[in-house]
């Protein structure tokens, strides 16, 4: 008897399951009752190894400096944090067994448990102490190491911003840096740095020692952080990369070579990094020295490099050679119609802390930043023409109202795609104010509704055409839109996006020419987004902590800041790339964020202020919202519902608490596991 099911039947059930999971996960991420391990979890199968392919090479394994999805795997699994979350999103003890808050001194005190560092052989090196957190934070605040998440420290830890800026300016002085605008840096014999900007009085910066930074090892098992203000999201921030510990003597010995290999990485988490060979293999093993080793059920995690993982992975699943693979939309139908594979397909656990949006490149030319150079768009994509077009608000609004996100989301979620659609950057149920009002119902965000409107899009297009023509823009405007070939179905999303948006905006006039380009599979962010080699790009952002300020990180830049942000909006204004009413909109957003950050004693007012700023960012089409992360269709032997969960940070990447089963999970089992957690 043929018991195959149709794709529509499967997807309808799975989309409802995923949508329910999203809602449940988002809500529990903001509160809920504590729970032990998920009930109904199957026991381990014949082995406790977990093998998966990967096809995108991480640029680094240094968890103190990275911020990308793939590269934080080691930090998430091999290094424990002060606090962690259970599988329902409830915070619990981690390396700290207790903590206290002193509002008068703005100081958190953490009391640490006994724990050890182990090397790549699993041998004990030294105990974990409070000083390891201090040394790690000093490493993050060292400009030479260019930590991508340094802003998560300088914004909240007392003295950190002054320390970092002084040493950044000192480095500039010692290396003879001259900024694009002519700003110079000099240092005298006493270490005082003078910064001289054109048309400004020189500013002097006295030496700042690390002792001035608000992190202290009171003794081996007592750690304190002194904050710049009573920041409500600080505890949730601790379950993220820049607040992880690192063994101080190893940092001192290895410097910028820290965590570039298994030999230069020490672990104190559920697993230790046993082997790492670039473009070959990546092995983590269970750490028997970990305090919670009894709740680690996987002995060996092996990641094997395969450039064609999306093709070879499913075939290796059929042969039982690996434990997980993504089932792309191009083969999903055949898998669901085949009795031998239909019960091997389920879904990943929804990653509710990630949202997706489109960014415009406001700086399409080569540009020098404080710690790297941006090449900009290639000449064939006409960056000069794009630079003129992107400064036109009506042009950008034609995109905002012309994009039908349902079409693009349907590539990965053929049924239930509207469950993932967003008209904001922040997802629903991320946090609520003191009265329990969802953040998306606060301030001006409460007025944002569906943007897609073909008639409005054409109105904005028609208004833009004479303005752009007067500015010297030629049509059609080339829109370079890259994708990462290692990301399943991203290429297909780009194709339907091009067809849909061109169908709207090119109706009656040759307005735009969306040119889809394949970026490199390895180091895509460094090669494309951070290198300015795009005009319009799908980006994502994962919340780092439970406060709306985290959703500003891709967009906000402090005055004069030259650090890494997705769009370099303020830099674009300061350096003359962004002009006119677009520049006004950018600066109004920056000022609104600066005012919102100052509100620390009234949560309702704080959330309203951030909501107003986010609404202005969107309504001025400085960014175009897309949707929430859609869980992939996968074949897996892991019950991810047993694992840690949080709506912020990297908890969802941790494999502690998860069993390897003796079979691939079906969709019905996936739903049962979800309901039993």
PLM segments and residue spans:
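Extracytoplasmic/peripheral linker and loop segments enriched in polar/acidic and small residues
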Residues: 10, 388-397, 401, 405, ...
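Local pocket/hinge segments that shape ligand/substrate recognition
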Residues: 30, 335-456, 580-584, 621-637
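N-terminal lobe/hinge region of extracytoplasmic solute-binding protein
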Residues: 53-103, 266
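Append "and occasionally in soluble cytosolic enzymes with long acidic Gly/Pro-rich linkers
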Residues: 92, 285, 386-505, 612, ...
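Ligand/substrate-recognition segments at binding pockets and active sites
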Residues: 120, 278, 319, 450-455, ...
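Gly/Pro-rich hinge or "lid" segments in bacterial periplasmic/extracellular proteins
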Residues: 180-183, 187-212, 220-221, 226-302, ...
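Ligand-site clamp/hinge motif
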Residues: 253-255, 259, 289-338, 352
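Long beta-strand-rich cores associated with HINT superfamily self-processing modules
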Residues: 556, 635-677
């Amino acid at each position: 008897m043929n018991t195959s099911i149709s794709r529509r039947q499967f997807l309808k059930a799975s989309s409802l399951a995923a949508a329910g999971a999203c809602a449940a996960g988002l809500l529990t991420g903001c509160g809920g009752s504590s729970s032990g391990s998920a009930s109904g979890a199957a026991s381990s199968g014949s082995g406790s190894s977990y093998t998966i392919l990967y096809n995108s090479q991480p640029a680094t394994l240094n968890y103190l400096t990275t911020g990308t999805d793939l590269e934080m795997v080691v930090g998430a699994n091999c290094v424990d944090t002060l606090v962690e979350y259970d599988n329902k999103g409830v915070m619990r003890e981690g390396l700290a067994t207790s903590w206290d808050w002193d509002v008068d001194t703005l100081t958190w005190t953490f009391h640490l448990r006994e724990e050890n560092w182990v090397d790549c052989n699993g041998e004990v090196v030294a105990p974990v102490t409070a000083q390891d957190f201090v040394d790690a934070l000093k490493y993050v605040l060292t400009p030479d190491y260019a930590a991508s998440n340094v802003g998560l420290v300088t914004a909240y830890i007392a003295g950190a911003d002054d320390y970092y800026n002084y040493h950044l300016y000192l480095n500039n002085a010692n290396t003879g840096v001259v900024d694009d605008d002519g700003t110079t840096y000099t240092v005298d014999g006493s270490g005082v740095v003078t910064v001289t900007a054109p048309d400004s009085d020189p500013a002097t910066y006295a030496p700042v020692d690390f002792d001035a930074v608000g992190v202290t090892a009171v003794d081996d098992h007592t750690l304190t952080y002194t904050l710049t203000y009573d920041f409500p999201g600080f505890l949730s921030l601790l379950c993220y990369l820049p607040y992880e510990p690192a063994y101080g003597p190893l940092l001192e010995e290895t410097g910028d070579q820290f965590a570039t290999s298994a030999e230069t990485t020490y672990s104190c988490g559920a697993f230790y990094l046993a082997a790492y060979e670039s473009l070959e293999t990546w092995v983590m093993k269970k750490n028997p020295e970990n305090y919670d080793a009894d709740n680690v059920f996987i002995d060996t995690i092996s990641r094997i490099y395969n450039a064609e993982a999306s093709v070879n992975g499913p075939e290796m699943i059929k042969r039982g050679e690996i434990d997980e693979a993504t089932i792309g939309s191009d083969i999903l139908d055949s898998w669901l119609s085949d009795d031998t594979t239909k019960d091997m397909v389920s879904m990943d656990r929804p990653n509710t802390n990630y949202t997706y949006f489109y960014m415009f490149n406001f700086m399409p030319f080569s540009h020098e930043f404080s710690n790297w150079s941006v090449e900009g768009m290639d000449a064939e994509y006409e960056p000069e023409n794009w630079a003129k077009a992107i400064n036109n608000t009506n042009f950008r609004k034609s995109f905002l109202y012309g994009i039908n996100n349902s079409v693009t989301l349907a590539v990965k979620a053929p049924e239930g795609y509207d469950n993932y659609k967003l008209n904001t950057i922040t997802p629903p149920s991320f946090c609520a104010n003191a009265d329990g009002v969802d953040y998306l119902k606060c301030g001006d965000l409460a007025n944002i509704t569906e943007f897609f409107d073909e008639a409005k899009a054409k109105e904005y297009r028609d208004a833009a055409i004479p303005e752009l023509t007067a500015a010297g823009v030629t049509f059609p405007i080339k829109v370079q839109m890259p994708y990462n070939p290692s990301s399943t179905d991203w290429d297909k999303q780009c194709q339907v996006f091009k067809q849909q948006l061109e169908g709207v905006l090119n109706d009656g006039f040759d307005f735009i020419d969306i040119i889809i380009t394949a970026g490199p599979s390895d180091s895509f962010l460094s090669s494309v987004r951070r290198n300015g080699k795009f005009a319009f790009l799908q980006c994502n952002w994962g919340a780092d902590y439970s406060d709306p300020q985290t959703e500003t990180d891709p967009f906000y830049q402090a005055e004069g800041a030259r650090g890494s942000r997705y769009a370099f909006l303020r830099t674009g204004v300061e350096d003359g790339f962004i002009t006119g009413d677009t520049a006004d909109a950018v600066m109004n957003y920056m000022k609104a964020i600066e005012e919102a950050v100052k509100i620390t004693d009234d949560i309702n007012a704080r959330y309203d202020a951030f909501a107003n700023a986010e609404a202005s960012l969107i309504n001025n089409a400085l960014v175009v919202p897309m949707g929430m992360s859609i869980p992939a269709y996968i074949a897996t032997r892991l019950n991810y519902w047993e694992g840690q969960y949080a709506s912020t940070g990297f908890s969802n990447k941790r494999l502690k608490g998860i069993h390897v089963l003796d079979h691939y999970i079906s969709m019905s089992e996936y739903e049962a596991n979800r309901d039993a957690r």
